Amino acid sequence: MPTIKQLIRNTRQPIRNVTKSPALRGCPQRRGTCTRVYTITPKKPNSALRKVARVRLTSGFEITAYIPGIGHNSQEHSVVLVRGGRVKDLPGVRYHIVRGTLDAVGVKDRQQGRSSAL
């Protein structure tokens, strides 16, 4: 506990909140170009081949974004829209590609859940 004299000498610093998606620069979504599309394996105890893409955003950042849904048409040089939202079992993947916008087509034969999330 600081004394009053110590508080006068240097005031309390406010706690700065750190953003979970710095590459978006405060925007809800960002456009980017795929530089590489590949699969990675999740951490324990899960097992799969998760589809991800390396994306160069208009903000200048190069990020790894998850491609949700079953089947995709994304390839190198595809222009995609990226939103925030991490994938819990993929370390370092903090963004999602928005399906159904720009070059990323929606999920084929999907009956439900045609929201922005997929």
UniProtKB/Swiss-Prot annotation:
GO molecular function: rRNA binding; structural constituent of ribosome
Alphabetical list of Gene3D superfamilies matching this protein: Nucleic acid-binding proteins
GO BP: translation
Source taxon at top rank: Eukaryota
GO CC annotations on file: chloroplast; small ribosomal subunit
Plastid recorded as keyword: yes
CDD domains for the chain: Ribosomal_S12 (cd03368)
Subcellular localization(s) per the UniProt record: Plastid, Chloroplast
Name recorded for this polypeptide: Small ribosomal subunit protein uS12cz/uS12cy
Annotated organism of origin: Liriodendron tulipifera (Tuliptree)
Gene: rps12-A
